[in-house]
């Protein structure tokens, strides 16, 4: 009697594959150091502009929320990232700092868990980044909220030092979106309403 072994991909295997594909895509493109506007405390509502007629133009939508007032050194700070996906079970939302995983950064900071909220034809993903003790190094770190699903990859960059310096100068924000349907598509981030 001959025994055959048939390998089937479990759910954890897909996450590893999806993360691997993301890392390849993220390293293949340059990530500009950009900031987001502090006047509203948020970039935009990630799911409000989605249209089923043109999903590749609007997905993924990504939003980052930060404190409107500068947090003093050694203070606690929470950044919140929200993404909207049409792939409820095949999407990842996570934070990076200077291109590295949060666990590799110096200082007291941690990622929250990813929560998922299913709404009609979309799924909202939420994930917080908590800086328990803001240091000069963390203040100058390029934090990136990354969102990956089978259709696209999106990154939102925020540097706290530039963000708070922007209270005086109001810089224009930007959001980088990489689509699997086009080589590199970049769109300007939300403006001040």
Swiss-Prot record:
GO terms for molecular function: interleukin-18 binding. Transmembrane segments: none annotated. Residues 172-193 are annotated as: Disordered. The keyword rRNA-binding does not apply. Residues 60-161 form the Ig-like C2-type domain. Its main location: secreted. It holds the Pfam family YLDV-IL18BP-like. Disulfide bonds join 81-145. Residues 1-28 form the signal peptide. This is Interleukin-18-binding protein.
């Amino acid at each position: 009697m001959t025994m055959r072994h048939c390998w089937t991909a479990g759910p954890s295997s897909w996450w590893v594959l999806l993360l691997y594909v993301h890392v390849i895509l993220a390293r293949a493109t340059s990530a500009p150091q950009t900031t987001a506007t502090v006047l509203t405390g948020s970039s935009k509502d990630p799911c409000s502009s989605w249209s089923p007629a043109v999903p590749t133009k609007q997905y993924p939508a990504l939003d980052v929320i930060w404190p409107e007032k500068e947090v003093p050194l050694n203070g606690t700070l929470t950044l919140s990232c929200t993404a909207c996906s049409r792939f409820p079970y095949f999407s990842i939302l996570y934070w990076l700092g200077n291109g590295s995983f949060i666990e590799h950064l110096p200082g007291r900071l941690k990622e929250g868990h990813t929560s998922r909220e299913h709404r009609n034809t979309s799924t909202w993903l939420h994930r917080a980044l908590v800086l328990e003790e803001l240091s000069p190094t963390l203040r100058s770190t390029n934090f990136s909220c990354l969102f990956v699903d089978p259709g696209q990859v999106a990154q939102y960059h925020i540097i706290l030092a530039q963000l708070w310096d922007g209270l005086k100068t109001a810089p224009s924000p930007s959001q980088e979106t990489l689509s699997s349907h086009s080589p590199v598509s970049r769109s300007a981030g939300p403006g001040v309403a």
